Amino acid sequence: MNIEQARFNMVEQQIRPWEVLDQAVLDLLYTVRREEFVPEQYRALAFSDLEIPIGEGERMLQPKVEARILQEVAPKKTDKVLEVGTGSGYMAALLASRARHVQSVEIHPALKSFGETNLRRAGIANVTVEVGDAAARGWPRHAPYDVIVLTGSTPVLPEALLDQLAPGGRLFAVVGEAPVMEARLVTSVGDGSFNTVDLFETVLAPLRNASAREKFVF
């Protein structure tokens, strides 16, 4: 496989047509090498438009979704980021390349180790990975955050996560239950108020222990 040609095809045929037009984001996809975050047995699929298995029943996001998230939350060099669900470490690597620091929380110890190893090998030093369950309660010990990214879906968006956004902070989450889910960007405008934009429809596996929607019994 010609890796650089495959990377080029991923950017031009999958990602750019998906309304990812920020040139800084597109350029980053050439410098943060996705194939180095993919399990060895799936390296040939590193640039494919699919969710690659990474163990523990979890999968990497599709490349176009990763790029779109980065474009929408638009991290700045002064930003502190919370990532819920480290996985392979690739999304954290993209965020860290634009932000001051990324605090990533992974519920599976094996994936914490996998993500940390990948990040270390890639020379990315401004990511801290911790084992924990941040799906419903966030990670208040380092709050507030300028950016929060959930790498799995949640039936409802927990108030705790919104409360951990700094003024002007942006949160990306896929909200809902299959088959109806929306990728959503929530921006804190201060005084406990938020601006919400639905970006696109998708279906994404839920985070472990994500907040459940209340069920009404008649």
Where are the language model's segments positioned?
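Conserved nucleotide-cofactor-binding alpha/beta core module
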Residues: 74-191
